[in-house]
Structure formats: structure tokens, C-alpha cells
A protein has these predicted regions:
Chain B
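Divalent-metal (often Zn2+) His-rich catalytic cores of metallo-beta-lactamase-fold enzymes
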Residues: 214-271, 275
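N-terminal export signals
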Residues: 1-23
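Active-site HxH/HxHxD metal-binding segment of metal-dependent hydrolases
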Residues: 78-79, 83-161
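Active-site-proximal loop/helix segments of hydrolase catalytic cores
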Residues: 169-225
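Active-site neighborhood of phospho(di)ester-bond hydrolases with catalytic His/Asp-centered motifs
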Residues: 69-71, 95-102, 118-120, 194-196, ...
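Metallo-beta-lactamase
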Residues: 22-31, 125-174, 179, 188-189, ...
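Conserved beta-strand hairpin/beta-sheet module of binuclear metal-dependent hydrolase folds
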Residues: 31-84, 184-196
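C-terminal regulatory/interaction regions
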Residues: 265-315
Length: 272, 315
């Protein structure tokens, strides 16, 4: 703060300096989490687009990282207007970005599970149609090694026997013409950071309507947990068929069709 | 007596150590039955502020020596516990039972001779497998509280159904469900059941190694015992003997139903950890915390069970 004021003073006293570009000042707002990696990640993810921390978007996660290989996060930007992109990242992970999602015809909501390699800020960033980025997040305490320990499927040795298994279901959500899709994959999501196990991860996924309209598409990175599970809210009505296609770094494709149930199952558990 | 002196010494030392974290365990045994004291652990998650001393511990006075059921999280705790227990009874500790593998109950055995430490064979196997990881986790969370604590395995496998100490007989029951090997003890003289972590009372049950159907079977066996009161693994003493059993069962039944309903209605893990907790559990400490841990333990399995396969052959 004091340094900022000093700079302002300097600028005020030296009118000439005002004409000089880029006074080595970060174009990004001060990080409320004081992360050592904030500016580096901001430069990479946001570039020259405007950024602000905004309480209207919510990055939700449990109060304890019970399993550093699989930490649940949900990024909810419903109610802030049209959204172009949603990025979930953890500043101090060796693979910081977990998911980069474009909700083309979907509510701006995504939930998944990520690896945590140490105590780190975990963040959600949402880009509005205007180009403005909104950011939220918090520090999460975690035991180390989520990215650098071998996946369970490698230890039990049965990952290949189940590779490509997908499970999923979709339910209508009230009156909004939206449906909630849950999809899970069996995949080791190898980070490449474990000795003698090269990177092997699902790297993209699309969700289309039965007529082929793109509803949502995402890039995934190996910091998504083993056996990825993803929740989205595409804008389709009950009875529609959702077509999910994913591809991994070996070029293997994964395809599934999930019909949207006619009835909501929300009687079973209260929807948040 | 020893505690008073310790507290006094701590007080005298305060000016010299001002600014340093206080890492002295204050152990307050409370007499619950004739010749049995309970040390009530903090009904909270393991945290630096409590030094990991969250598990309940029993001290039992017998004609031939002092018995302990569980030993706390660290060498320092185990040493303090030994001094307090021997000061109380005037007899040396001759047996330490470890009820199950978890480190809040068993890392304190580092302060004792392994030859007097007894546990179920399954618990010893599990401690050999997971002990190193538990130790790392406690060092990370507790720092200096753990100084000097080494992983020690119990030297005696419990295979007998009871053990007699100069006429005071303890029934030893090999059960499971909270973990793969859960020891429960019944003091025949007083009818006190010492349930280990099969019993939680006004403190939400923890499930990192749980098998819920086996846990229910074990609770059935405990409910049928001729006991008068129960000392749970966590939470206050249960003078009725049945309340902790009923409460533990109520929670694990609700937990399984709630998580199943959450998976079947499309909630993700974050949302499942946020579902309302019924009002009847309002008095349960650490309820939201344990629910969210349990989501982590059970959700992938429930998804595999309830979400239908949807993949098409690779084309």
C-alpha cells in the first residue's frame, strides 16, 4: 500500500513519467490470497483482458481436503450474465489449470475433483461475454503429493481393465429448460510426474445435443483427479439425448449417450 | 498431583517461553466407575490447538497393575498419560490396549514397551501398512507435538476372548466396521463397555476405513451385551450404555441414505457435503466436517453403484 502511494506521488510529481507506458506495475488487481504465483497465472490465463475479484461467482469446496488426490470443487457463475469461459486452477499445483470450460449452451456451472500437490490457492475464473474476468477462490490446506503420487489404478494394476468405462445420468432442473448432467470416466489421468509413468490424460470433452448443437466443451488437464467426474448444466429439455465425446492424449476417444430423464429426482435429496 | 506440579512448572516457565506455542498436554482423568477413569478427548478434528488429543482413553486399576485402553496421538502424550495414570493408581502400567489402527488412538504407544501393548492381529497388520502414512499426516498437522514419535507396532496379538488381571477380568471382543479390526472391551466387574471407535457419542462418526454393514453387525453385538454403561471412542461418557450405540447407528444409517439419495438425484460431491443435517444430530460435534469427509470416502463407490454405464464401443 505504502509503495503504491509512493508510486502515485512519484507520478504526480513527474508529469513526464505519465506519458511513459508500463511503469512495471502489474495490470492485475492485488491478490487477496497473496499468492506468489498470482501474477504469473494471471498473465497466462487472462492476458490483457480486465480482471477483478468478484463475490458474485462462487468457488465451492469442502472445509477439509480429505483426499489430496481428489478434492471436490464446484464453480458456480449463475446470475452474472452470459459467460464465455470458466477456468478452475490451483496456483501451486505443478499442473495449475485443471479445467477450461466453455458453456456454449449451458448454465455457467461446473463441478469436478482435482489433485492438490500441496497447500495452495484454488480458484475459479469466469469470463463474461464482455471479456471481463471474475475471479474467486481460497487457500486450501492439503497434504502433499496429489499430483506426484501414482494413481490408485496404477497401484492396484487394474486401470487398463476399466479404461473407457463411462457412467452418467441427466435430470431436468425445474422450469428453466436446463438439465443437470453427471458423467464419470475410468481413466488414470497420469500427470507425468510419477517415475516411469508418462503423461496420459483425457484432454478434451464435448457435450452436444442429439441434433449436433454444441452445448459445452472443455479442455481437461492431468490435475483433474483419476477417474474424472464432471457435473454440467446444459440447456436441454427432458427427453433430449446428450452426446458426450472425449479424447485422451493417446488419441483414444470416449463416447456416450445420456438421455435426460423425464422427471426430476430432486425428491430424493434437496437441490442446493 | 503430578498435573499440578506440571502446571506450576509450565506457569513458572511462561516468561521464558512467551511467544512459543504451548505444547504441553493437560490430561484430566475423570472417575467413571470403580477403578476406571476416562480421559475425554477434544470432540473436534485433529488440530494443532488440541495436539491431536481427540480420542477418549480409559485407565483401569487392577490388583496387579494399571491398564490403558488407547494411548493418544504422540510420544509426548503417551509419556504424560503414563505418568498421570501411574500417579492415579500408584501402580505401573502393565498393559496398553490399542482399539484400532487410527493414529489418534495408537501413536502414543511409542512411550511404552511394545511387549505390553496388545491389539487385534488385523489392527496390527493395518498399522504396519498405514502407520507410516498416518505418522506423516500427524507430523504435518501437529508439528512439535509429535517430536520424537516413532511408529511402534503392538507386540502382543490378541487371540484370547478375555484377559484376567489379579481377578479383574476384561472380555476382549474382536469386531469390525469402523475399521477392519475393532477391539471392544467389557469390564466384568463394573459392566462398563469400552467401545473404541465403534462408538461415537454426541460427536459425528468418522469413516475413513469404515465398512458400514460390518459396523451395523458389530453395533448389534454390542447392544446385546450385559453392560451398564459405555465409554465411547469419542464424545462424552454414556451412563445408559445404549445411547452411544443407538446414536452411532442412527448416523451411519442416515449417512448412507443421504449419500445414496445425493448420487441418485444428481448432486456432485460439493453439493452432497452441503446437504442439510437432520435436527436430531444438532448436538453432534464435527457433524458437517465428518459428513464432508464421508462424502470423500463413499461417493466414488456410490457413483459406480448407482450411475448407469453409458459408454459406447470405441469407434
Amino acid at each position: 500500500m505504502a509503495r503504491c502511494r509512493f508510486l502515485q506521488l512519484l507520478i504526480a510529481m513527474l508529469p513526464l513519467a505519465m506519458a511513459m507506458p508500463a511503469l512495471a506495475r502489474s495490470p492485475y488487481p492485488d491478490d487477496p490470497l497473496q499468492s506468489p504465483m498470482w501474477t504469473a497465472h494471471a498473465r497466462l490465463i487472462f492476458g490483457d483482458d480486465p480482471v477483478r475479484f468478484d463475490p458474485r461467482i462462487q468457488l465451492l469446496y469442502p472445509q477439509v481436503a480429505e483426499n489430496q488426490r481428489s478434492f471436490p470443487v464446484a464453480l458456480d457463475a449463475r446470475g452474472v450474465g452470459p459467460v464465455k469461459r470458466m477456468v478452475i486452477f490451483a496456483d501451486l499445483n505443478p499442473i495449475p489449470i485443471a479445467i477450461d470450460y466453455r458453456p456454449d449452451l449451458a448454465e455457467p456451472y461446473i463441478a469436478t475433483r482435482i489433485k492438490l500437490d500441496q497447500r495452495t490457492p484454488v480458484r475459479g475464473a469466469v469470463q463474461l461475454a464482455s471479456g471481463q474476468w471474475l475471479v474467486a477462490g481460497g487457500w486450501v490446506d492439503a497434504a502433499g503429493g496429489g499430483c506426484s503420487a501414482p494413481p490408485v489404478g496404477r497401484i492396484t494394476g487394474d486401470w487398463a481393465a476399466h479404461l473407457g468405462e463411462m457412467r452418467g445420468e441427466a435430470w431436468p432442473m425445474g422450469t428453466q429448460g436446463s438439465s443437470r448432467l453427471r458423467i464419470t470416466f475410468r481413466h488414470p489421468m497420469d500427470t507425468g510426474l510419477v517415475a516411469n509413468i508418462p503423461t496420459y490424460a483425457i484432454e478434451e470433452m464435448t457435450v452436444r445435443s442429439d441434433s449436433g448443437t454444441m452445448l459445452g466443451q472443455m479442455a481437461l488437464f492431468a490435475s483433474v483427479s483419476e477417474d474424472p467426474a464432471i457435473t454440467l448444466i446444459p440447456r436441454v429439455a427432458p427427453g433430449a439425448i446428450l452426446s458426450i465425446v472425449a479424447r485422451d492424449t493417446n488419441g483414444r476417444t470416449y463416447a456416450a449417450k445420456v438421455p435426460v430423464a423425464r422427471q426430476s429426482a430432486s425428491v430424493l435429496a434437496p437441490q442446493p | 498431583m503430578k498435573m499440578t506440579r506440571r502446571a506450576m512448572l509450565a506457569g513458572l516457565a511462561l516468561p521464558a517461553t512467551a511467544g512459543m506455542a504451548n505444547t504441553t498436554y493437560l490430561i484430566h482423568p475423570v472417575a467413571v466407575e470403580d477403578g476406571i477413569w476416562m480421559i475425554h478427548g477434544d470432540d473436534a478434528p485433529i488440530h494443532f490447538s488440541n495436539g491431536g488429543a481427540i480420542a477418549n482413553i480409559a485407565i483401569i486399576d487392577t490388583p496387579v497393575g494399571t491398564l490403558l485402553v488407547d494411548s493418544g496421538p504422540s510420544l509426548r502424550y503417551g509419556r504424560t498419560l503414563k505418568a498421570v495414570a501411574e500417579g492415579l493408581t500408584g501402580k505401573p502400567v502393565i498393559r496398553v490396549y490399542v482399539t484400532h489402527l487410527h493414529p489418534d488412538h495408537g501413536m502414543g504407544i511409542a512411550a511404552f514397551d511394545p511387549a505390553i501393548i496388545a491389539a487385534l492381529p488385523q489392527a496390527i497388520t493395518d498399522m504396519a501398512r498405514d502407520g507410516r502414512g498416518f505418522s506423516d499426516a500427524l507430523y504435518r498437522l501437529l508439528g512439535d507435538w509429535m517430536r520424537g514419535t516413532e511408529l511402534v507396532l503392538p507386540g502382543r496379538k490378541i487371540t484370547e476372548a478375555s484377559e484376567d488381571f489379579g481377578g479383574r477380568r476384561l472380555r476382549l471382543m474382536a469386531l469390525a466396521g469402523h475399521s477392519a479390526g475393532d477391539l471392544a472391551l467389557l469390564d466384568e466387574q463394573t459392566g462398563l463397555l469400552i467401545g473404541g471407535d465403534l462408538l461415537f457419542h454426541d460427536r459425528a462418526p468418522a469413516t475413513p476405513t469404515a465398512d458400514l454393514p460390518r459396523w451395523r453387525t458389530s453395533l448389534d453385538s454390542l447392544a446385546k451385551l450385559p453392560h451398564r454403561a459405555a465409554l465411547p471412542g469419542h464424545g462424552p461418557f454414556d451412563p445408559t450404555g445404549q445411547e452411544a450405540i443407538a446414536q452411532t447407528r442412527d448416523w451411519i444409517d442416515w449417512l448412507e441414505d443421504a449419500l445414496t439419495a445425493a448420487v441418485r438425484s444428481g448432486l456432485d460431491m460439493v453439493e452432497a457435503g452441503s446437504v442439510p443435517i437432520p435436527a436430531r444430530f444438532a448436538g453432534m460435534a464435527a457433524a458437517r466436517y465428518e459428513l464432508q469427509r464421508s462424502v470423500s470416502h463413499f461417493y466414488p463407490g456410490l457413483e459406480a453403484k448407482w450411475l448407469p454405464r453409458v459408454d459406447m464401443p470405441e469407434g
